[in-house]
Amino acid sequence: DETIVQHDQTFNLALHRFPGVYEPRGHKYITDFEYTPTPTITYRVGGVILRKEMLWIHKRTQLMIRYTLVEANSETHLRLRPFLAFRDKHALTHANMEADGHSYPAVNGVKCRLYGSFPWLYLQTSKPGTEFVPAPDWYYNFEYLQDLARGYEGHEDLMTTGYFETELKKGESIIFSASLDEMGSTKTIEEVFAASIARRTHKIDFLSCLEHSARQFVIRRPGGRTEVIAGYPWH
């Protein structure tokens, strides 16, 4: 979840579904969406304009998100709270006493592993001095309407081990990275993001959109074998 903090007031930009209710309702702050070169959402909260660019890194198990404070008239903080499941894609997780809610130091961030049978997940940022506040807790009953409509289980509990918080100045950006591999420095995070977004094609017509979508079905297995996967969008 992303939260804007200004004048000791918090504005949560997230949107979650729980039984019978959507909370928080961050969609009301969305003013723009762009698909190319990478999915980008623009939020406006009063005098604050925040841009969010989401990027899966090619051939890596890594998600990167760049937040840019486009406009602000007073001191503004950004708070980032990751939610963790650590499960198979065909299962849902529920609150339990076995999950390890601790966070352990990593380069400009932390690493987490709820269960010993899973790999470490590295949560890092590109801005030196970003504070991580440990606050482990379970959030209950996230509801997935499409799963319920298909006759599957559709309620899940998610763990948060804490949140990142930093002050952003007008025009300043911060990159959040979630990866199975640790980034060696804040500079590396910036370089990986820049290189990855530079290789993205601009999806401006039917053919370019079709080529982009087709590439998502081509995967490379750990052993180096390249395959075309069926049903990927539904997983």
Task: Annotate the PLM regions.
Residues D1-H235:
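Acidic, mature catalytic/reactive cores of soluble proteins
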